Amino acid sequence: MTGSNMSNALANAVCQRCQARFAPAERIVNSNGELYHEHCFVCAQCFRPFPEGLFYEFEGRKYCEHDFQMLFAPCCGSCGEFIIGRVIKAMNNNWHPGCFRCELCDVELADLGFVKNAGRHLCRPCHNREKAKGLGKYICQRCHLVIDEQPLMFKNDAYHPDHFSCTHCGKELTAEARELKGELYCLPCHDKMGVPICGACRRPIEGRVVNALGKQWHVEHFVCAKCEKPFLGHRHYEKKGLAYCETHYNQLFGDVCYTCSHVIEGDVVSALNKAWCVHCFSCSTCNSRLTLKNKFVEFDMKPVCKRCYEKFPLELKKRLKKLSELAARRAQPKSSGLHPA
């Protein structure tokens, strides 16, 4: 277009907003082929010039950034800021793509997809883990699906057994597979190697072996049946196929002192069908220390030293003597009553 033709075109042109013509020397704003007086090129909402010439167009009308956000831009459900550009609509809310993340592992979900789980938006691996946790099952660390049957444990992680083959024979593995030096073997191949199996975890023992209770154990897995603390070479006590530390063996199976009611550790004084700690066995009247070498008398099912007994009233001593003789006769074996002819 020549200069004269352009001048003629501008002389006939009108402002897009006010529809008035332009003065010959007037500055004109051209926005995508639309012409405006400079003072007419303003926000359709606040009627102010666009800061730095930046505007947003919606349904043929132009808005400054602030008014466009207030009128049309959704707020992000995570950061609360207005969203300009791509909007993720999910969980009855709007999100920036970078703000829509898995609520457990924080991975971005915009391009991965998500699964709704108990009101939460989760990535699929986290959803599978939560689902498995609710069912009391494991998640396979290779395919990230729930393991419905028995898992194969490898390097402390759970897997579907059919993801692996025996290192020696190449057969597909089952949950009975064994790990040895970082490799997996089927049970027959593993047994041929003669490696001891821990009686607790059922896994191979590659280091020190504890032989006890007719089984073999990892050192850290041979523990007290009560407190579950490893013995680590300390003495253990066996009862009905189980091992106990000294403290809990005494608590469960040891003698309890008649006086202090504590489990007796060390020597036991047995008398009057009861048990005492050595330092607790004393006269029930004067509390003087007794031993089995001392003479004592039973009174009210308790020991009384000879000195205190001598102070008892005469009638009481006679009654005690009679009771003692009666108890002695009852303790003697009865004769059959038959006599030879």
UniProtKB/Swiss-Prot annotation:
Q: Does the keyword Transmembrane apply?
A: no
Q: Which UniProt keywords apply?
A: Cell junction, Cell membrane, LIM domain, Membrane, Metal-binding, Repeat, Zinc
Q: Which residues form the LIM zinc-binding domain?
A: 13-74, 76-133, 138-195, 196-255, 256-315
One MF annotation (Gene Ontology) recorded for this entry: metal ion binding
For this entry, list what GO says about its biological process.
cell-cell adhesion; cell-cell junction organization; positive regulation of integrin-mediated signaling pathway; positive regulation of substrate adhesion-dependent cell spreading
Q: Which InterPro entries match?
A: LIMS1/2-like_LIM1, PINCH-1-4-like, PINCH-1/2-like, Znf_LIM
A UniProt-annotated Pfam family = LIM
Q: How does it sit in the membrane?
A: Peripheral membrane protein
Locations listed in the record: Cell junction, Focal adhesion; Cell membrane
An example GO CC term for this entry is:
cytoplasm
Function description: Adapter protein in a cytoplasmic complex linking beta-integrins to the actin cytoskeleton, bridges the complex to cell surface receptor tyrosine kinases and growth factor receptors.
Assembly, per entry: Interacts with integrin-linked protein kinase 1 (ILK) via the first LIM domain, and in competition with LIMS1. Part of the heterotrimeric IPP complex composed of integrin-linked kinase (ILK), LIMS1 or LIMS2, and PARVA. Interacts with TGFB1I1.
Q: What is this protein called?
A: LIM and senescent cell antigen-like-containing domain protein 2
Q: Which organism is it from?
A: Bos taurus
